[in-house]
Amino acid sequence: MTSQSVAKKLNHCFSDQALFRTALTHRSFGTPNNERLEFLGDGVLDFVIAASLYHRFPDLPEGDLSRLRANLVRQETLHRLALELNIGAFLRLGEGELKSGGAQRPSILADALEALFGAIYLDAGFEASRAVIEKLFAPLLDDLKPGQFQKDAKTRLQEWLQGRKKALPRYHLLEATGAAHEQRFEIACEIESPALRTVGHGSSRRIAEQVAAEKALKELLA
């Protein structure tokens, strides 16, 4: 099996093989790497998913559409799709990153998938990238049930406290470890009344805050 199996699963044949190689090149390997392609692919992905949701759910308000999109483009979802494509087997990583398990790291795999979207956009244009993304995300889009979609934990916690005329929670960064693109965050969620403090961990501040908020909700509703 070669890296071309990834392109085949994406149903795209690269005219510019250098773009394909760069999309699979982590910054630890050297330059050029996939960081700029990941930036581009992130924007393409956001737009394609936003447009798909807009047309699929004509009656949903903006807030619900935003939450659905956030759920679809989050790191966990991209990581799962990258595993299905076996991207990790073909990543070009520096020796240290390779030894530390970088080929299985969720953030690296998610970034590489977005880089591939960016590479396809540059290689063949927007319609080609849109077709690849829509096909890859079709099962996830088909499974969406907006009527059952739940607001994120921070929003639900805020609404629970507001409904009881309580002060809003405060989120504090306790610790951030790791290199810039591989950081782990520890966030505390503190509630004044009823007195409660929970801690969440994640690969971004947003994820860590959501984890801490979810823990607080479980405590309050227990």
From Swiss-Prot:
One Pfam family from the record: Ribonucleas_3_3
Subcellular location field: Cytoplasm
Top EC class, one word: hydrolase
Active-site feature positions: 42, 114
Domain RNase III residue range list: 3-125
EC number: 3.1.26.3
Major localisation: cytoplasm
GO MF annotations in UniProt: double-stranded RNA binding; metal ion binding; ribonuclease III activity; rRNA binding
CDD domains linked to this entry: DSRM_RNAse_III_family, RIBOc
SUPFAM superfamilies linked: dsRNA-binding domain-like (SSF54768), RNase III domain-like (SSF69065)
GO cellular component, one term: cytoplasm
Reactions performed catalytically: Endonucleolytic cleavage to 5'-phosphomonoester
Cofactor or coenzyme needed: Mg(2+)
Keywords assigned: Cytoplasm, Endonuclease, Hydrolase, Magnesium, Metal-binding, mRNA processing, Nuclease, RNA-binding, rRNA processing, rRNA-binding, tRNA processing
Annotated Mg(2+) binding sites: 38, 111, 114
Gene Ontology biological process terms, A to Z: mRNA processing; regulation of gene expression; rRNA processing; tRNA processing
Domain (DRBM) ranges: 152-222
Family the UniProt entry places it in: Belongs to the ribonuclease III family.
Job of this protein: Digests double-stranded RNA. Involved in the processing of primary rRNA transcript to yield the immediate precursors to the large and small rRNAs (23S and 16S). Processes some mRNAs, and tRNAs when they are encoded in the rRNA operon. Processes pre-crRNA and tracrRNA of type II CRISPR loci if present in the organism.
Subunit description: Homodimer.
The name this protein goes by in its record: Ribonuclease 3
Species: Dechloromonas aromatica (strain RCB)
Phylogenetic placement of the source organism: Bacteria, Pseudomonadati, Pseudomonadota, Betaproteobacteria, Rhodocyclales
